Amino acid sequence: MNKKELFDAFDGFSQNLMVTLADIEAMKKQVQGLVEENTILRLENTKLRERLSQLEHENLAKTSSKQGKDHLEGIYDEGFHICNFFYGQRRENDEECMFCRELLDRK
């Protein structure tokens, strides 16, 4: 192999290295963009999970409150007082009690 062929081989090898280096830099930028996007999506996912948990907690509180009110309505409909003054006593002739009604009509 003479000197010219040797220099041509080195020149070709050098050009291949430059192309490879450019490809690596492009891949590096792409990976960096993906990492940034992944970080943003992770943060958004965390916030959404927190919000979902908060909504589930609020829904559970509303449900348990409604179930308690429904239970009191059932007791009242069976003919018993649910007010603080006469709780558990039977209502005479299923008469309305303004104290019990006030409890049931609260929001």
Swiss-Prot record:
Cofactor(s), names only, from the UniProt record: Zn(2+)
Predominant subcellular localization, coarse grouping: cytoplasm
The UniProt keywords, alphabetically, are: Cytoplasm, DNA replication, DNA replication inhibitor, Metal-binding, Zinc
Which InterPro entries does the record associate with it? YabA (IPR010377)
Query: Pfam families per the record?
Result: YabA
Q: Which GO terms describe its cellular component?
A: nucleoid
- What does the note accompanying the cofactor annotation read? Binds 1 zinc ion per subunit.
Q: Where does this protein hold Zn(2+)?
A: H81, C83, C97, C100
**Subcellular compartments:** Cytoplasm, Nucleoid
Q: Which GO terms describe its biological process?
A: DNA replication
Q: Which family does this protein fall into?
A: Belongs to the YabA family.
The record's NCBIfam families line, in alphabetical order, gives: PRK13169.1-1
Self-association or partners: how does it assemble?
Homotetramer. Interacts with both DnaA and DnaN, acting as a bridge between these two proteins.
What the protein does?
Involved in control of chromosome replication initiation. Inhibits the cooperative binding of DnaA to the oriC region, thus negatively regulating initiation of chromosome replication. Inhibits the ability of DnaA-ATP to form a helix on DNA; does not disassemble preformed DnaA-DNA helices. Decreases the residence time of DnaA on the chromosome at its binding sites (oriC, replication forks and promoter-binding sites). Tethers DnaA to the replication machinery via the DNA polymerase beta sliding clamp subunit (dnaN).
* The protein's name: Replication initiation control protein YabA
